[in-house]
Each structure stands twice: as C-alpha cells, then as structure tokens.
Amino acid sequence: MSDDENIIKKIIHEGTKAEKLELFGFEFQTPRKKIRSKFKLFARACYPRFFDEKSADFHDDVIMDLIMSYISDNKLVAGFRGCAKTSLAKLFIVFVLLNDKDEHRKYLKVLTKELKNAKQIVTDSYNLILEVSNLYGDQFAKEGDIKREETMGGYTMRNGTKISAGTIGQTQRGHVQDAYRPDWILFDDTEDVKSISSMVITQSIIESCAEAIKGLSLDGSFFVSCNYISDQGVVQWFMNKASVDVRIIPLLTDDQ
C-alpha cells in the first residue's frame, strides 16, 4: 500500500469531518478520473453494503459515463438486469448532491415509465443522504415549520438544488409543469416487454422523452440507464440520436 493510500485510509477511518469532506469533495475543474476515485471512496466508505461482492470491471466505465453526463454529455448505458447500473446511478446522485462544491447542476430529474419507480429512486437517494447526516449535517431545505419533502416525489437541498421524480409513461392527471428547467435528467426503465409490444405505447413514450429533452436547460444533459430488449423501441430511439454516446454491457460469463 502506497503512502497516499495509507493517508486516505487513515482519513476515512480516523479523519476529522473537514478532512473527509475535502477527500470526497470535487469541483468542475477536478480531473474526471479523480472525481471517479472520489466517488468510489465516498460510496465504499459511506455505503459499504452496496459492495459486498467484488465490483465488475465495467463499473468504472459506467461511473465515468455518469460523471461525463453530469458535466456535459448525453450518455446511454444498456446492461443486463443485476449489473448494478441503477444502484450506481442512485449513489452517484447522492455523491453529487453532497460533494459538488461548484453546484454545477441545480435541478436533477428522474424519469421512468412508471412514476412509482422514479419516486423510489428519489426516496432512496433521500434516505441515503439521511444516513450520512453525522458527516454532512442536515442538508435539506426547511421553510419555517413546513414539513420537508421526505417520501414524496422530490426534495430540495439546503443550497437550493432540487431533485424530482416524473414519468415518461402515461400522462399523469393533474400533472404540474416545472417552474424551472431541469439541467440533468436520469432516464431509467423507459420500456419493458409490455410496452415494447405496442407501437402506440412506444411512440407515446418516445414523444414524452423528446419533450423532456427539449425541456432541459440550455446547458443540460441526460443519462439513460436501460435494458436493451428490442431494436424497435425507446432505447433504440435514444441510441439513434447523434448526440448520445452509447455503451452496451455484455453478459458476464462464469469466468468474469
């Protein structure tokens, strides 16, 4: 183990709050590979239960795609169920909400075919932030004695950064238009076997995705986490977009 690794290990286990916050914190100008290293340190130190098994080699690529998407690029990662792409995305959301010193993104949005799935991702991120309140303090905005948005479809951080859940499935009755344009979108579970069997449903989802992308802020970007189940569906529509960088994760074999 190198001297630097020993120092990092000592900070994680014995360091002050200030030392840990500096270890995990990043800025827009921080080299991207260094941000990835900081994310991995943060995730493993704060949420070790997500790493009971050895991480697959492709996880580094997925993390880098998340970082580049958050910074400026449109990325798509298509992988098999169980490859941890959604878990990594949730941990990444928590990482940037807590550690981005420049607050590069001010409004994050999670969009799924079924609204309940987007709400679950948002709620999970909220609960993960609560778990590290001993290090980061209370990070949620309060307005007098008004109850914070806890298990609902969104919440606001103390610095003003927002995250909310939405759907690209059926139109929600009473849907309220966003007052502000999101500047980063996570598309997750945009289609399934049922939706792919209907061109009407597929086209409706595509139109909703297109509308969401059009509604991004001028410097906004998005990340698509998906399973590639058809070359005629929503995922293929994303893949065909010239502005989207695509990564397809192959199935692991027994020796991988």
Map each language-model feature to its residues.
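Short, flexible loop motifs at catalytic/binding sites
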Residues: 1-83, 87-256
